[in-house]
Structure formats: C-alpha cells, structure tokens
Amino acid sequence: MSRIRIHVVASIILFSASVHGASPDLNQHGLTGSWYDPAKSGQGIELEVFPDLIAPGTSLVQGAWFTFDSAPVGASDRERWYTFNGNGQSGSASVPVTIYQNVGGNFDALPITQPTAVGSGTLAFSDCSNGTLSYTFTDSSGRTGSTPLTRLTPNVTCATDTAPGTDADFALSGNWFAPATSGQGVVLELNPGSQSLLLTW
C-alpha cells in the first residue's frame, strides 16, 4: 500500500485569542477521529484534520462518511460511502465541505474510480466531543438534513481555549490506498493515548 497522508503531531497550538467559549478551533489535529450518532450506530464518519496544510491558519478537513441508502425494513443493505473535504479556518468551529461519491468500483480490484461531487454540507463542532454534519445532496436523491455527531474514539489532543489537549504521536494514522485500485482504501487511526487502533476499509 502507498501512503497518501502522513502526519505527526508534535504540539498542540491554542488559538485562544480567536476562539470563543469552549468551541474547538478547526485548524487543529485534535478533531481527527471517529464520530457517529448513537441513535444510528453502525454508521458515521472518519475525520482527518491537517492543520496549516493549505496556508498558515488554514487546515485541510477531509473525511469518509459511512452510511446507507434508504430501503424498506428487511430489505438488502445498500451501503453508501461518501467522502468530503473543505478548508478549516483558525478561529472557526465550522467548515463548509463538498461531498463526493465514487461509483463503478469492484471489491479490492480494478477499475480505478474518480470522485464526483454529489452535494455540499457544513461540519460544525460545539466542543471537542460533539458536532453536527448538515448536508444537501444535488444528485437525484435530493436528500437534505443534518446528523448529530458524538466522538467515538477517545479525545486526546483536541483543545479549546479553556481545555488544552495533550501531545501525542499519531504518525501512522491517516489514509492509505493501493494506486492500482485508487478510489478505495483504508483509514487508519492509531491513538497512543488510549492504546487503541481503529481501521475502516
């Protein structure tokens, strides 16, 4: 497998001058992790935040959204896997994102697939453990709404102006893929603070 993202967190920088209350700053790695709605357990998002990657004070926010298509009770599962990305700003606890979908692939095999924009949304956090993903799809589904998010994996490094995070090395965490089957891959979260490893494929 080839690695497309490597990040090492050496320190957590607090932007207390521009952050209000306990809302977290989106230009920090600490929001990276697994998030879900307990009422809809079995689906959720894997979030990656790369601080200052776009420019000083501007992060790359990207994620994978594991969910399902609408189906009658008892019908066959119809999984849906979307990806999204946007640019987080220092001093802001929300970020607009574009939602993408890859279609036409095969399990762990060719062909390579390309992402197609199918909607937009806003990812917002009230604190280091709770957030909301609002979405509007522009494809034929016409779906619109929002889903609450609760942190699934333990918080280690997320910081606000009232609650600093701790340092941790997440060097192996990130997105991994095989170039021959680009359009699919795994998200790896290695959390040294909680001595846990989570992999989504």
Predicted region positions:
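Bacterial N-terminal signal peptides that target proteins for export
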Residues: 1-8
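N-terminal signal peptide c-region/cleavage motif recognized by signal peptidases
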Residues: 16-18
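Mature soluble binding/inhibitory domains
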Residues: 21-201
